[in-house]
Amino acid sequence: MSSMTQNLREVMKVMFKVPGFDRVLEKVTLVSAAPEKLICEMKVEEQHTNKLGTLHGGLTATLVDSISTMALMCTERGAPGVSVDMNITYMSPAKIGEEIVITAHILKQGKTLAFASVDLTNKTTGKLIAQGRHTKHLGN
């Protein structure tokens, strides 16, 4: 396991255990961290679902936001930035008990903006569940 992966695991432990919104991600497991790429997994549980028993769109958006931000922290600059724009395209449902893989890529990082893409896929079938794009302002 790389030191980057180990360091990020420690950050995630703290983030997901303190009071606040990030606790909704406490079931997310970090698989690997590399410069500009992060892979996580999560088993869909009842607490993650909408009334139809599928992964809630709001949680999907939170995964896009948080996992892409952590991927940005794995770059040389290491700045998490603040969100400027985010969009998510929902393509297929994820049901209770299904394992999903969340893969974030940093597409470009400039002086003030960074651009990321995030794919959520079914771990068993590889089917694309959702795809997100996230633009972050990095400051001056």
Curated annotation (Swiss-Prot):
It catalyses: a fatty acyl-CoA + H2O = a fatty acid + CoA + H(+); decanoyl-CoA + H2O = decanoate + CoA + H(+); octanoyl-CoA + H2O = octanoate + CoA + H(+); butanoyl-CoA + H2O = butanoate + CoA + H(+). One of its GO terms (biological process) is protein homotetramerization. Belongs to the thioesterase PaaI family. It holds the Pfam family 4HBT. CDD domains: PaaI_thioesterase. SUPFAM superfamilies: Thioesterase/thiol ester dehydrase-isomerase. Keywords: Acetylation, Cytoplasm, Cytoskeleton, Hydrolase, Lipid metabolism, Mitochondrion, Nucleus. This is Acyl-coenzyme A thioesterase 13.
